Amino acid sequence: MVFKRAVWALQYIRSMTIDFRSDTVTRPSPAMMEVVKNARVGDDVFGEDPSINDLEAFTADMFGMESAVFCPSGTMTNQIAIKCHTQPAEEVICERQSHIYQYEGGGIAYNSGCQVKLIEGNRGRITAEQVTAAINPDDIHKAKSTLVSLENTANRGGGSCYEMDDIRKIRKVCDDNRLNLHLDGARLFNAIVAKKQQPKDFGSLFDSISICLSKGLGAPVGSVLLGKKDFIKKARRFRKVMGGGMRQSGIIGAAGLYALQHNIDRLAIDHEHARQIAEAL
């Protein structure tokens, strides 16, 4: 009897607990599960999964970019983007607390053979002036600076967001120095909702964008990498090399499409809840 009461008490406590470890600790809604149950599927490695094709086309159109590819994780989309943009012995410029540097298992070195130039930013954000100062001169003794990567929102910056004017200035620096510009947009929709921006605002400024379908949006798994057609064609090859080619993946792709179509605006509710918690603490 004592054991049963202890089990009941533990179950009750768990039912009253809110898990704040991550915005990925979610469960699909009944409506999302219904979409998953009825998802049309095919072989995505052969480009024949209609649900994945719909997701990729929808996302590319949303951002005003030419093409997109679905991957299992944001780490994979980031690493594929870096691999596509660089050659071994080149250099990637990013903020010191960036996810691509802190949380992707040394993937830049392992997958792309590149070194990293770290910038000490302000809550995860860097400026055009800092990027300019970080670019290596054309010197055979130096690694060639090839790619700048931004993160918006910045995870270890406490969810800080870039202003569009600041991104435009960084874009100009990249153009002037022939560098590509990648966006780790795992939580980009939080920034879009908070700042009342549009996805196409970002699509016009970056060579590649990675977005996550689970962080804040409630899909069980998956990320999308966006870019030009030739870039995404190359990305599909690296996705296969990294083990990211899936077969009947429309089951999870359908959940991701549902999340994009129904769950973005409700991020404003999350933001209000976060403000209430911050004020209470």
Stretches found by the model and what they are:
Residues M16-A39, D43-L281:
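Conserved PLP-enzyme active-site core in the AAT-like
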